[in-house]
Amino acid sequence: MRIKLYGRVIGIFLKKHSFINVLISLQLIAVFVIGIIMTSIIDEKASSYEAVKPLLNGEGLYCGGYFLKDNENGGLLENTDEIKTQLKDVDFISSVNFASLQTGVDTQTNEVKTAYALVYDDYSANLFRPTIEKGSWITDSKQSDDIPQAVITRNYQGYNVNDIAEFETENGTLKVRIIGVIGDNEKYLGANSEYESNEPSYQLMLSTHFNCLNDQLKNKGFTNEEIALKLESLGYSADSIVYNEPVLFFTDKEWNKTDLDSVMSDSLFIKYNRNISDDEKLYNRKYINENLSVLSFAIQFSQLNNNSQTIVYRELYTLMPIMCAIYLLVLIASVSVNAINCKNNIRNEAILYLGGAKRKQLLTINVIYNGLICIVSLIISIAGSLIFYKAGLFSKTVITLGWKPITICLIVCAVYILSLIHI
């Protein structure tokens, strides 16, 4: 009987003040969408650093460049054992190796088109796991196959999960089974050749890839005119749609099935033992600089870690006040509109009170009424964001629908309902 009464009264409130209710709902949807966007941005900034933080917390060197056997004889190194034997007090060395595969010939420029292979050892494959758009990451595959398995970036060839991709090599045609696809603008472990900063940080260790060069330039803030000039400088017409070469990711176990060589010309992580002395660090750094490689960089973990913390905290300190200000403005507006709504309902509540309804019952009706509007708004926000996400409209952004954005929305929903309880 009481449930029917509550339902009837709430139905009257919703119908009588439909315009105000829609206005409140739109404001709440704005709050939830802003929450999803801002939480995704903050999480993206923090989570990338958190993934590599355990490594950077220790002592060691992060190196990038072409690693040679020695200055006199040349010859690119293919494994880390040759380096470790020459260094002092090293715990382990992990690498990301590089290889090039031919995919065809560009019809406009007659240049050979290539795909780039990154080969991870066990440590580097698990150090940073990119967000997979389809399929699984290289360490998660449970398939047993004589054909090498790899993950690929989104690509103009249209290779998808379970496809057999073919590439030309010095040993003939190489067949690769695709087990996963990484979307545009997703980070992966590999030296970022485009990173320019006086504060080298974790961002130097992570690269991003776009299937389309036009989209990549647009993501960097290039105008349409600047993109046209850039394309012309590369030998294309100004209105061309130019595709980047795909990147493939292998474990060293899978790469060994190819009988092809890979070289240490991307990333090298040299982790020292905890008690390494300053003299041994100096020796290692000097040996790398003078004997082993044509270096792009060799940076201490401690420097990367300190700069990473500075950059992440700086960005969070910038974003948090903006997020809080927007939240408060929209939330206060929602509460204000709801206060007007409550004022309009005073007459109805007075009638119920005179009819025998107790204050606790009126409070329950008010909570259910406001909670219903808030929950419906939350469902619309999440459902709408999910539709956009599935449609790929967020593919070039950092917006995600993980548990963190949804948790923030639930907290805001609870705070909103509690703020409207008449004490």
Where are these regions (language model features)?
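Short beta-strand-to-loop capping motifs
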Residues: 65-69, 250-253, 269-276
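Short, membrane-interfacial amphipathic segments enriched in basic
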Residues: 1-8
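Hydrophobic secondary-structure segments that place a key small or acidic residue at a functional site
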Residues: 113-240
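Membrane-proximal extracellular/periplasmic loop immediately following the first transmembrane helix
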Residues: 39-122, 223
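Conserved small/polar residues in nucleotide/adenosyl-binding loops
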Residues: 421-423
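Transmembrane alpha-helical interface segments in multi-pass membrane proteins
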Residues: 329, 335, 348-397, 408-412, ...
